[in-house]
A protein has these predicted regions:
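Periplasmic OmpA-like peptidoglycan-binding domain that tethers envelope proteins to the cell wall
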Residues: 383, 387-390, 596-673
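Periplasmic peptidoglycan-binding/anchoring modules of Gram-negative envelope and division proteins
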Residues: 563-597, 624-625, 630, 667-673
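A short, solvent-exposed loop/turn motif at the edges and junctions
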Residues: 517-533
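Structural motif corresponding to the intra-repeat A-B loop/turn of tetratricopeptide repeats
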Residues: 54, 88-89, 135
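Short, conserved micro-motifs composed of acidic
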Residues: 24, 28-32, 113-123, 127-130, ...
């Protein structure tokens, strides 16, 4: 009988050990499977690299959670769960509970990839601080970071990089407390479901009239449908237009811009006709440019070697006048990781050698996503250096008259958050900004947002827009618009109309007298004088411009010919217009013209006749001195006999605007041989 009891005991003992062995083998197998996926999220404790990848955490989380439920005293699993939740964006607050458990069993001999490890690494403190930081619990985060520093000292951890990072995180939390306590007066709105998706949507760029939006998306349906190793769809560029009810449903911009690789928006010209895009180029990362011809985008062209190097260039933006490129690069010779650089457009139309923007802008950390406002002096960019409140923050800096940049200023909370805030563009009037960010009420991983400033003054700029037609009312083709400063004679911008719609758009800064010249082959130029005074307001001006053909009888008003008061002496402000006239005459050597002077109704008919003749003759004399044969031009004065507008209003009062239109010089084609 005793023998039977003994055999039964031995049988149960062996069975129990076999079950334990099987359970142990199953745990080891499941752990190794989870660990392989987990490493997509967490690289190693030494470099504390977290990758915010949907593919990584979402795949690893359920496997590790299942193991943890079987062994809730396993602090290695608690640590890994904390990492997964920390990288999940929407469940970060859940990370705190698991890190709180993990720090109760810290080991200096952590072997996280071993299924036998039941303790957690020292860096659990740092990640716990990150979780508090990202959840706006700044005092708790500071306390945990300080505990982390103390534990490193106690354990004689001499890793200076980790110590510096912890101290820097404390400074970020202190900055965050200050910024959150004094929020910017701003209304932040999600651009909505027609723009944003459940996937990552970011890097918005807009035309100056805020009617056309381009952005980058990793949504399902991307060209080629490929995914990266983290499970994200490849980047494509999408567009949306403003309607009476909001933004239209975003659609892919299509070929030849979107391919089966990665394409992202980085910059847009004010008129919305030129896009700067980022292409992955097998990890090299380069900037390309593409322009709109009617409603068809051209094949993207890679910018030259002064911009694109063998290193990484992830973002760029061109100034509104097209003269300066601001871009990001991690090339050697900078101040840290990624730095901001500038390049000037050469007279030959190429980008010149890049110049680092210097230590006022660049730090030992990363700067990215530059945006230069249409005013030409206000720079916005993202940085995880300077006084960031966490991750990348948006900063602004002003260009002074001596060419130096002011100390960057954090644009504040709630635009900036403890997380990454990047890709920020501002409307010409300065009252709205568009940016991408992760927010708790968003649709996806990152969404595009609009910020409306509630206590900010308008930026004093003038937006010029309109259409250019030919003599028949049809869209004029190949129109070039040249904007010149009449005082300095310097060309400040050259623009082109859309070949399908005839539309144009450009920005004028205040305090200048402009010659705006519209030109197309086979047509007389049309010039406009625009005096933009020093002002405090933002203006939008719409123009319908018509070009007259080069044929007998066609005429134009020379709106940028100026004389001293009551005299026939050409003022220096006329030089740009005289140069345009000279080019017109040289380009059409068989053309003869009449240059006519006109006055308003003030003064005697005899006096006005003499003044108008003298002024017409002054223009002819200038062209003759520049080499145009005198027999091709006839100077004629009409005095006040041919008014272009009424000198008086219907009620008999004076009409200053009409008088100004009447005081003019015209050119008329009289003969073409």
């Amino acid at each position: 009988m005793k023998t039977l009891h003994f055999l039964a005991f031995i049988s149960r003992f062996i069975g129990s050990n076999l079950n334990a062995q099987n359970n142990n083998e199953n745990f080891q197998k499941d752990f190794n499977t989870a660990e392989k996926i987990f490493n997509k999220v967490y690289q190693n404790g030494k470099d504390e690299a977290l990758t915010y990848s949907k593919g990584g955490y979402s795949a690893a989380l359920p496997l590790i959670l299942s193991l943890y439920k079987e062994d809730t005293l396993n602090m290695n699993l608690a640590f890994k769960l904390g990492v997964c939740y920390l990288s999940s964006k929407r469940h970060r607050i859940d990370a705190i509970a698991y890190f709180s458990k993990a720090i109760t069993a810290i080991t200096n001999n952590y072997e996280g990839s071993s299924y036998k490890e039941r303790n957690a690494p020292l860096i659990s403190y740092k990640f716990m601080g990150d979780a508090y930081h990202l959840n706006y619990q700044f005092d708790e985060a500071i306390a945990v970071y300080k505990k982390y520093i103390a534990e490193m000292a106690e354990n004689k951890n001499t890793d200076k990089a980790m110590l510096d990072e912890a101290n820097r995180k404390i400074e970020m939390c202190k900055t965050a407390k200050i910024l959150v306590a004094s929020p910017v007066k701003v209304k932040i709105e999600n651009l909505g479901v027609t723009v944003n998706s459940i996937y990552a949507d970011y890097s918005p760029v807009l035309s100056a009239d805020q009617q056309t939006l381009f952005f980058t998306s990793r949504r399902e349906g991307s060209t080629g449908g490929q995914k990266d190793e983290e499970g994200n769809f490849f980047e494509d560029i999408y567009s949306s237009t403003k309607t009476k009810t909001g933004w239209s449903m975003a659609t892919g911009i299509g070929a030849p811009i979107n391919t089966d690789g990665n394409e992202a928006t980085v910059g847009l010209s004010p008129d919305g006709q030129t896009i700067l895009i980022y292409k992955d180029d097998n990890g090299d990362g380069n900037i390309y440019s593409t322009s709109l011809n009617g409603d068809v985008w051209a094949k993207p062209v890679k910018l030259n070697e002064n911009i694109n190097s063998k290193y990484w260039e992830p973002s760029a933006f061109i100034s509104a006048d097209g003269s300066t490129l601001y871009f990001t690069s991690d090339r050697p010779g900078g101040y840290g990781g990624r730095d901001l650089y500038t390049s000037k457009l050469s007279p030959e139309g190429d980008w010149a050698k890049a110049v680092n923007m210097g230590p006022a802008i660049n730090t030992a950390f990363d700067e990215d996503a530059p945006f230069i406002h249409p005013d030409g002096v206000t720079l916005y960019f993202s940085s995880n250096g300077h006084n960031t409140m966490g991750g990348f923050d948006i900063f602004t800096s002003l260009l002074s008259d001596d060419g130096t940049w002011s100390e960057p200023m954090n644009v504040g909370y709630p635009i900036n958050t403890p997380d990454d805030d990047i890709y920020y563009v501002v409307s010409p009037d300065g009252l709205k900004a568009y940016f991408s960010s992760f927010r708790e009420n968003g649709f996806g991983e990152k969404d595009n947002y609009m910020a409306t400033f509630l206590a900010k003054k308008e930026t004093p700029l003038t937006l010029m827009q309109g259409v250019v037609n030919d003599e028949s009312g049809k869209v004029a083709q190949d129109v070039v618009i040249t904007v010149t400063d009449n005082v300095s004679g310097q060309v400040v911008g050259v623009y082109r109309t859309n070949s399908k719609t005839g539309k144009f758009l450009f920005i004028l800064v205040p305090g200048k007298n402009y010659n705006i010249t519209y030109q197309a082959k086979g047509h007389l130029f049309n010039s406009e004088n625009m005096e933009i005074p020093k002002q405090s307001n933002y203006y939008e001006i719409n123009r319908a411009v018509s070009l007259n053909p080069i044929q007998v009888g066609s005429k134009i008003v020379l709106n940028n010919i100026f004389f001293d008061f009551d005299k026939a002496t050409l003022r220096p402000l006329s030089n740009v217009e005289l140069k345009n006239l000279l080019m017109l005459m040289k380009s059409n050597p068989n053309m003869k013209v009449e240059i006519s002077g006109h006055t308003d109704s003030k003064g005697s008919a005899e006096y006005n006749q003499k003044l108008s003749e003298a002024r017409a003759q002054a223009v002819v004399a200038s062209l003759t001195a520049s080499g145009i044969s005198a027999d091709r031009m006839q100077a004629k004065g009409y005095g006040k006999s041919m008014p272009a507008a009424a000198n008086k209003n219907a009620d008999g009062t004076d009409n200053p605007e009409g008088r100004q239109l009447n005081r003019r010089v015209e050119l008329k084609i009289t003969q073409i041989n």
